[in-house]
Amino acid sequence: MGKKLVMAQKRGETRALCLGVAMVMCAVITYYILGTTMLPLYQKSVWTQESLCRLIETNIRDQEELEGKKVPQYPCLWVNVSAVGKWAVLYHTEETRDRNQQCSYIPGSLDNYQMALADVEKVRAKFHERQVFYCFSTTQENETSVLYQRLYGPQALLASLFWPTFLLTGGLLIIAMVKINRSLSILAAQK
């Protein structure tokens, strides 16, 4: 009976140890992936200065002029603000600025034109409700654009590091508990 109990205990310890090591390895892999993808974007972000923006005007643009002809396009919002003592164009995020510099806000779903237009009008109404809000600007002197929201800010970095840290801590705790259990069982067997 005693030998079966010891064998079962060893199998359970081995499984728990494997679980702990697997959790630690997953955390290390996740840290590596985040370190090569998210961290460089955070470090390269120039939108670090938080400023107070005042709304100047908003326009809904749904046509683009190409070669003198107006071509239908998805609806988007154009927002002009006063920030850091000068006129600037407000962009929703870094990606909005990269996708289309003629739009401050691009709706998420562009499949249905009417739904996209309703989304843009809702965002426009929110801007008109709050005339003064916080935005992010760069320290570059000649930059005439600001961001409403940073994609790669400190909150995003901390949120993405939460689960790997939780996994690493849990794995290390499991490994520590197995090692403590082994040493206590050896001490108990010696007495």
UniProtKB/Swiss-Prot annotation:
Residues 37-157 are extracellular. Its main location: membrane. InterPro entries: K_chnl_Ca-activ_BK_bsu. One of its GO terms (cellular component) is voltage-gated potassium channel complex. Residues 1-15, 179-191 are cytoplasmic. N-glycosylated. GO terms for molecular function: calcium-activated potassium channel activity; potassium channel regulator activity. Glycans are attached at N80, N142. It is found in: Membrane. GO terms for biological process: detection of calcium ion. It comes from the Eukaryota. It is a multi-pass membrane protein. Regulatory subunit of the calcium activated potassium KCNMA1 (maxiK) channel. Modulates the calcium sensitivity and gating kinetics of KCNMA1, thereby contributing to KCNMA1 channel diversity. Increases the apparent Ca(2+)/voltage sensitivity of the KCNMA1 channel. It also modifies KCNMA1 channel kinetics and alters its pharmacological properties. It slows down the activation and the deactivation kinetics of the channel. Acts as a negative regulator of smooth muscle contraction by enhancing the calcium sensitivity to KCNMA1. Interacts with KCNMA1 tetramer. There are probably 4 molecules of KCMNB1 per KCNMA1 tetramer. This is Calcium-activated potassium channel subunit beta-1. It comes from Oryctolagus cuniculus (Rabbit). The gene is KCNMB1.
